[in-house]
Swiss-Prot record:
NCBIfam families: trpA (TIGR00262). Belongs to the TrpA family. This is Tryptophan synthase alpha chain. The gene is trpA. It comes from the Archaea. Its EC number is 4.2.1.20. The alpha subunit is responsible for the aldol cleavage of indoleglycerol phosphate to indole and glyceraldehyde 3-phosphate. GO terms for molecular function: tryptophan synthase activity. The active site is at 47 (proton acceptor), 58 (proton acceptor). Gene3D superfamilies: Aldolase class I. Pathway: Amino-acid biosynthesis; L-tryptophan biosynthesis; L-tryptophan from chorismate: step 5/5. The lineage of its organism: Archaea, Methanobacteriati, Methanobacteriota, Stenosarchaea group, Methanomicrobia. Keywords: Amino-acid biosynthesis, Aromatic amino acid biosynthesis, Lyase, Tryptophan biosynthesis.
Amino acid sequence: MMGRIESVFAKKGKSAFIGFTVAGDPDKETSIRIAKALIDGGTDILEFGVPFSDPVADGPTIQRADDRALASCTTPDTIFAIVREVRAYSEVPIVFLTYYNTIYRRGIDRFYLEAHEAGVDGILVADMPVEESDEVAATAEKYGIDPIFLVTQTTSNERMDTIVRHARGYLYLVSVLGVTGARKTVAPEALALLNRVRSHTDLPLAIGFGISTPEHVTTCNLAGADGVIVGSAIVDIVEKNLGNPDAMEQDLRRYVSVMKKAAEQ
């Protein structure tokens, strides 16, 4: 039976729109409303950032979202409750982007079991080298969760082959050197990375870090990307509307709809 993530990428001729939000930002109930708005706008895969006190891969926009979530006492229990409610609302694939310390403190088996029971389809551990991922990857497989990995411009071809052997679902291609955050253009190096990774695997390839406009999406589409990942631009909309959740939902639906339209062209 085809999994939810695999089903998204099986739709030929269309690029998947992967929308990111920090779970629990700015609080549990608003976070659920944000997730539903992203889904209503047309998000193909929903990526929840698990808030962490030292998110080394994230720029200031997402760091502030993490801070808001932690300030509202977001815990793994909160996050799994959010996922359960979103899963009851939609069959859209749900992916976690987390850091290893969160999994370790919960217990690897317990974390993946609870993720599976809540309805999570994939987990990306941002600070886990593939060489140290055997236990996590085996636990993910045990519970039917896709282990997703990052590939960067500095990833060697040899290391890429190792990543490909461990990865399921899709590969997250980091478009720039540095942290997350909106950029003006898609770097030519990102498109070169896409071509290089494509020669190593048939897994779907999604480009993230710095994607924020329909023009960015079109550029990625023309280069042959299977998906685009948008985070900071979404979190920025949340931040600008913290005092007005209704306007926040409306702006999120509108933004995702425009980006989704570009992904389908």
